[in-house]
Amino acid sequence: MKAILINPEKEEVTEVEYSGDYQDIYKLIDCKTFDVVRTSVSNDGIYIDDEGLFAKEQAYWKFDYCDDQPHIKLVNKGLVLGCNDEGDSIAPESTVDYIKSRIIWRW
């Protein structure tokens, strides 16, 4: 299934293939533990490195959740996936262009 990879080091947002196996999230975002930040689109979320602030190399970025809320400050790679009613990961409803439009690199 498709997913959206956010790479703040390269300042890139790209579509990638995700197998559906949660262990691949670790590989795609280069982390040992992850957490999820909600987006304003449907049930989409951004998987992030839960220990990003402790990483030796850090690349900062902000996600503009919605116009009337402060930006969410994040560190290192993120992976956008959707979620169905059963809690399973699915392709996100967000588009690459939408995600790009909501990111501010560095903070």
State where each predicted segment sits.
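Short beta-rich binding modules
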Residues: 1-107
